[in-house]
Amino acid sequence: LEFRRVLFRSRSPKVAELEAAPSVALVFWCKRLSWQLRIQATATVQRSGPEVDAVWTRISQSPAAGDYLSAKAPGDVWEEDASDAPSDNTQHFLGIVTLQIQNMDWLELARTGHRRAVFTADQWEWRVP
């Protein structure tokens, strides 16, 4: 299973963290359904290439382009007198993270009894909650 197109600023310190340790976990909660979904995945970082170029071509014409043109990296100390003027429109810092999903663990909490199942690419099975 593959989950694509998580966009990021390639100057973010988080990118180096993903490259050093690509195992990730995502946790989602839906209050209305009382469902929790945990996803274990492996991240691959793309800083350049045809896919990044294609996404940038679309984003570069939108207000979101400024998010990927900043002269500063996310988390840098903000200095009142320093400029955060965007770089020219050709030097962007857009990247894509692709997540290869290893498994998904679904849990439903209910007064009538909890349910849990684990899904992989080729099977699923009920588990004790």
Describe the function of each predicted region.
Residues 15, 31-35:
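Short Lys/Arg-rich amphipathic alpha-helical segments
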